[in-house]
Amino acid sequence: MATRTQFENSNEIGVFSKLTNTYCLVAVGGSENFYSAFEAELGDAIPIVHTTIAGTRIIGRMTAGNRRGLLVPTQTTDQELQHLRNSLPDSVKIQRVEERLSALGNVICCNDYVALVHPDIDRETEELISDVLGVEVFRQTISGNILVGSYCSLSNQGGLVHPQTSVQDQEELSSLLQVPLVAGTVNRGSSVVGAGMVVNDYLAVTGLDTTAPELSVIESIFRLQDAQPESISGNLRDTLIETYS
């Protein structure tokens, strides 16, 4: 399922939220429409946590995470950290990262298996990404851009990259990541796809300006047409087994 919304007149959904397969973070103080877009699709499948990071609302740009963990910058307050620990599932590791490039969401793009990172990220940060998120880490650029987190949106099903990414680069990245990639835009032609949308294995949320063709590319590359939360499909499977056994 792909859906469109806005955060206080901004279409940059990936700036104000973070979506993984086990949790969803949303910035505080948005309009009800913004929250209800997530609540309507996610229901009780995963927790939706209202938070700030380092006192800011740009939580999607400050954090990086997947179903196993969440990395936050060292400026994150103790209170914010405690709130996250109380709200996220116990299986999710939360780790402060001392990194000069503190907008982690701009310099890390990951799914549950691999991460692309800014070429100049600290060696210690690279090790933390690997340990906390349980992923293989590759230092990369996307179409010559070092802010890989801003110009790539990734799930375990597929990925959307900067529209000027060459076919050769797409193929190289695709074989690294082991998922199909497509070059495209969100929010009526914006190339900053990482900041313009969030996605997990069954839901994408983009800005209100996203056109129908852009939305259909997103639904197709992330295989969202009949996707549903694992917990729901798991329950359904159990029910079917019981019914037919």
UniProtKB/Swiss-Prot annotation:
Query: Out of the domains of life, which is the source?
Result: Eukaryota
**Major localisation:** cytoplasm
Q: Which GO terms describe its molecular function?
A: ribosomal large subunit binding; translation initiation factor activity
The UniProt keyword set, sorted, is: Cytoplasm, Initiation factor, Nucleus, Phosphoprotein, Protein biosynthesis, Ribosome biogenesis
CDD domains under this entry? IF6
Any one GO cellular component localisation term in the record: nucleolus
Compartment(s): Cytoplasm; Nucleus, Nucleolus
Q: GO biological process: what's one of them?
A: maturation of LSU-rRNA
Posttranslational modification, per the record?
Phosphorylation at Ser-174 and Ser-175 promotes nuclear export.
Q: Does Phosphoprotein appear among the keywords?
A: yes
Modification Phosphoserine, positions: S174, S175, S231
Task: List the SMART domains hit by this protein, alphabetically.
Answer: eIF6
Q: Is Cytoplasm found in the keyword set?
A: yes
> Other notes on this protein?
Present with 18600 molecules/cell in log phase SD medium.
Q: Explain the purpose of this protein.
A: Binds to the 60S ribosomal subunit and prevents its association with the 40S ribosomal subunit to form the 80S initiation complex in the cytoplasm. Is also involved in ribosome biogenesis. Associates with pre-60S subunits in the nucleus and is involved in its nuclear export. Cytoplasmic release of TIF6 from 60S subunits and nuclear relocalization is promoted by the GTPase RIA1/EFL1 and by SDO1. Also required for pre-rRNA processing.
Subunit note: Monomer. Associates with the 60S ribosomal subunit.
Q: Which family does it belong to?
A: Belongs to the eIF-6 family.
This chain's protein is named Eukaryotic translation initiation factor 6
Organism from which the protein derives: Saccharomyces cerevisiae (strain ATCC 204508 / S288c) (Baker's yeast)
Gene expressing this chain: TIF6
